[in-house]
C-alpha cells in the first residue's frame, strides 16, 4: 500500500494544531505556577526546598516532554516526519534492533519507557534529602527502571517475537529449559561453562604448590628466564574471587608477564569457605594469608624481604598485614603494589549503598560468630551494580530467546564465586564500608597490634581504573596520603577488571601518568599525560628501579622445609562454592 504524503495545506493545518497545543500547555503551566505561587521562576518565593515548588517544576517538565514526545510520534506516524530521538546511555544495547526505531508500535513503547525513566531520575535528583539517601534512591530507582524495560518482556520485545516465529516456538521451549536449569543451579548462566576448565585453558602458567594450610595454597611459578630477581614477588589476589583473573591464559596473564620479566613469582590461592573454616576472622586471614606466605617465601628463596602485590580486597588485606609488620618492627617487605585497592572508604561508589548499619548488624547476628556468606550472594550483589549487562541481558537471551551463552573467559571467572567466613566478612564490612576505621591510625587492633598505615615505609605503586564502579579511582588515589612510603600513582583506562588485565601485546586502551601527587585527584588528572597501551611496562620499569639485583634461576621448586605438594593451579582454586 502506498501512502500519499500530506499536502502543504494539511501540513500547515497540522502545524497550527501544534501551535494551539503549545499555547494550551503554556496556559496550563501558568495556571499551575499561579496555584503553586511560582509564576516567576526567577523569583520563586517558595524557594527550591518547597515541596510545592518541586512538584510544580516536575509537572512542567513532565508535560513539556509529553508534548514533545506526542508531537514527534504524531509527525512520524501520520506526517512522514523524522524519527523521535531518544537519548540512550552509552553502551545501552537493549534497543539496538531496527524494529525499535523503524516500527511505530515499538518506537512508541521505547519512547514511553525512556520518558518515564527520565522523569523518575529527575524526581530523585530533585528530592530534598541528604546525599547518602539520594544515592540510595538513585540506585534502587535504577534497579526498578532496568527491571521494567520493555525489552525484558516477550510481548514487547520484537527480537523475542521474531525468534519465536522463525523457530516455531522452539526458542521459547529452549528458554524454559534454560530457566529450569538455572533454577536448579541457583544462579543465571552467563557463559558457556563447558568451554573452560581451570588448569586446562585457565590458570595454566607452570608452577607448583609449595605450602598450604586450611585457608590458602601458595604457588611458586617456574622461572622462564635464566636469571631472576633476587627479591621475590608475592601476589595477594582478592579473597572474594578466584585468583586466576591474574592468570587467565597464555598471552592474557599478569602472572605470566611477571615471570617473563624475570620476577620470582609466588601467589596466594584462597580457599572458598566451607563449614570447617566458617569461624575464621579477619585476623586469621592476615595471619594465615600474607603474613604466613611472606615467611614461607623468604625461607624458600633465602631473601630478606619480598615485593608484595595486592589486588582489590587482596590489596586491603596486604596493606593491613604490612601495617602489622610495621607495628611489630619486622622489616620483611621491599615494595608494595596495590591494584584498584581502597584504604579510605569515604567514597565507596554504589557498592557502599548496599552496606548499611542494619545489613551489617543482621549479618553479625546470624553469621558473626560462625557461618558462611555464600558466594552466590556476593555474585548477585555485584551483578546488581550493572543489572542491564549482568542480569537482564541474560534473562532475555537465555530465557526469552532460548540462546546458549557465549564462551568468555572473564565471565567464566566472574561466575566462579567464592564464599567467605561470616566473622571475617562482618569485621571487614563494619571497619571499612560502614565505619571507615582502617585509615585512622590506631583505630583498629589487628593481630594484637594497633594498625597505622602511615608506618608502612616502603615504596608503593598505586593503580586505579578510571571507570571502576567498585573502587572509584579518586578513592584509590587517596591511598598515597595514608601509606608512609614514596608513592607512584597510575590511572588505567576502562573498569575494575579490564583496566587491570591489559596485556601489552594487544596494544589496547591507555593509561595516565603524572609524577606530581600534590594536587587533588582532579588536578592530578588534568595535568596527567595519557599514554597509549598497557600500564604493565610502566609497572615493570618501576619494579626494576627497585631491584636488588639478579641471581641464577632456581631449578627446583620449594625447599627441604617446604617440599612440592602438587602442580599448579592446585586444589583450592578448583573447589566450587556451595
Language-model segments: which ranges?
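Amphipathic, low-complexity, repeat-rich surface-exposed segments
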Residues: 1-216, 228-229, 266, 479, ...
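Alpha/beta-hydrolase-fold enzymes
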Residues: 129-162, 299, 303, 317, ...
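Short beta-strand element of the alpha/beta-hydrolase
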Residues: 228-239
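Short amphipathic alpha-helix adjacent to the substrate-entry channel of hydrolases
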Residues: 247-265
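Alpha/beta-hydrolase active-site loop
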Residues: 277-301
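Alpha/beta-hydrolase fold nucleophile elbow
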Residues: 294-314
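Short beta-strand/loop motif that positions the catalytic acidic residue
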Residues: 456, 462-464, 468
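Short alpha-helix in the alpha/beta-hydrolase fold that links the catalytic acid
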Residues: 472-482, 493
Amino acid at each position: 500500500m502506498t501512502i500519499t504524503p500530506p499536502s502543504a495545506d494539511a501540513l500547515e493545518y497540522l502545524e497550527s494544531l501544534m501551535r494551539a497545543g503549545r499555547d494550551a500547555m503554556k496556559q496550563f503551566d501558568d495556571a499551575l505556577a499561579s496555584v503553586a505561587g511560582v509564576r516567576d521562576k526567577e523569583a520563586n518565593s517558595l524557594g527550591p526546598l518547597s515541596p510545592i515548588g518541586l512538584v510544580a517544576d516536575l509537572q512542567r517538565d513532565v508535560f513539556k516532554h509529553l508534548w514533545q514526545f506526542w508531537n514527534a510520534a504524531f509527525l512520524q506516524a501520520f506526517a512522514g516526519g523524522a524519527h523521535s530521538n531518544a537519548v540512550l546511555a552509552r553502551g545501552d544495547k537493549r534497543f539496538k534492533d531496527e524494529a525499535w526505531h523503524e516500527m511505530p508500535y515499538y518506537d512508541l513503547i521505547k519512547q514511553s519507557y525512556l520518558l518515564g525513566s527520565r522523569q523518575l531520575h529527575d524526581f530523585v535528583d530533585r528530592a530534598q534529602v541528604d546525599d547518602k539517601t539520594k544515592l540510595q534512591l538513585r540506585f534502587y530507582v535504577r534497579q526498578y527502571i532496568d527491571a521494567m524495560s520493555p525489552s525484558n518482556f516477550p510481548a514487547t520485545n520484537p527480537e523475542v517475537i521474531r525468534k519465536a516465529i522463525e523457530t516455531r516456538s522452539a526458542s521459547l521451549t529452549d528458554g524454559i529449559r534454560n530457566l529450569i536449569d538455572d533454577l536448579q543451579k541457583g544462579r543465571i548462566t552467563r557463559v558457556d561453562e563447558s568451554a573452560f576448565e581451570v588448569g586446562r585453558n585457565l590458570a595454566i602458567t607452570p608452577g607448583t604448590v609449595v605450602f598450604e594450610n586450611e585457608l590458602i595454597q601458595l604457588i611458586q611459578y617456574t622461572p622462564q628466564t635464566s636469571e631472576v630477581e633476587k627479591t621475590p614477588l608475592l601476589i595477594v589476589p582478592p579473597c572474594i574471587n578466584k585468583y586466576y583473573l591474574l592468570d587467565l591464559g597464555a598471552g592474557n596473564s599478569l602472572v605470566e608477564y611477571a615471570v617473563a620479566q624475570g620476577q620470582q613469582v609466588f601467589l596466594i590461592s584462597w580457599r572458598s569457605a566451607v563449614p570447617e573454616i566458617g569461624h575464621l576472622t579477619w585476623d586469621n586471614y592476615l595471619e594465615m594469608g600474607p603474613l604466613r606466605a611472606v615467611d614461607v617465601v623468604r625461607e624458600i628463596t633465602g631473601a630478606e624481604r619480598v615485593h608484595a602485590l595486592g589486588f582489590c580486597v587482596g590489596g586491603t588485606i596486604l596493606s593491613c598485614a604490612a601495617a602489622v609488620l610495621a607495628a611489630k618492627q619486622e622489616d620483611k617487605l621491599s615494595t608494595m603494589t596495590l591494584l584498584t585497592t581502597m584504604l579510605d572508604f569515604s567514597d565507596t561508589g554504589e557498592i557502599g549503598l548496599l552496606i548499611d548499619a542494619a545489613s551489617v548488624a543482621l549479618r553479625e547476628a546470624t553469621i558473626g560468630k560462625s557461618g558462611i556468606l555464600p558466594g552466590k550472594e556476593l555474585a548477585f550483589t555485584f551483578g546488581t551494580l550493572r543489572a542491564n549487562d549482568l542480569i537482564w541481558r541474560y534473562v532475555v537471551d537465555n530465557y526469552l530467546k532460548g540462546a546458549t551463552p557465549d564462551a568468555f573467559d572473564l565471565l567464566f571467572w566472574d561466575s566462579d564465586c567464592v564464599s567467605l567466613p561470616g566473622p571475617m566478612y562482618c569485621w571487614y564490612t563494619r571497619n571499612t564500608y560502614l565505619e571507615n576505621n582502617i585509615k585512622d591510625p590506631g583505630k583498629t587492633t589487628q593481630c594484637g597490634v594497633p594498625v597505622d598505615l602511615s608506618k608502612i615505609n616502603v615504596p608503593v605503586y598505586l593503580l586505579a581504573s578510571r571507570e571502576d564502579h567498585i573502587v572509584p579511582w579518586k578513592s584509590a588515589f587517596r591511598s598515597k596520603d595514608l601509606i608512609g612510603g614514596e608513592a607512584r600513582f597510575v590511572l588505567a583506562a576502562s573498569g575494575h577488571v579490564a583496566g587491570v588485565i591489559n596485556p601489552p601485546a594487544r596494544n589496547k586502551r591507555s593509561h595516565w601518568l603524572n609524577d606530581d601527587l600534590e594536587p587533588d585527584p582532579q588536578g592530578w588528572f588534568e595535568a596527567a599525560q595519557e599514554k597509549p597501551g598497557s600500564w604493565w611496562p610502566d609497572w615493570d620499569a618501576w619494579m626494576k628501579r627497585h631491584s636488588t639485583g639478579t641471581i641464577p634461576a632456581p631449578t627446583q621448586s620449594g625447599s627441604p622445609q617446604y617440599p612440592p605438594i602438587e602442580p599448579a593451579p592446585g586444589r583450592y582454586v578448583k573447589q566450587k562454592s556451595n
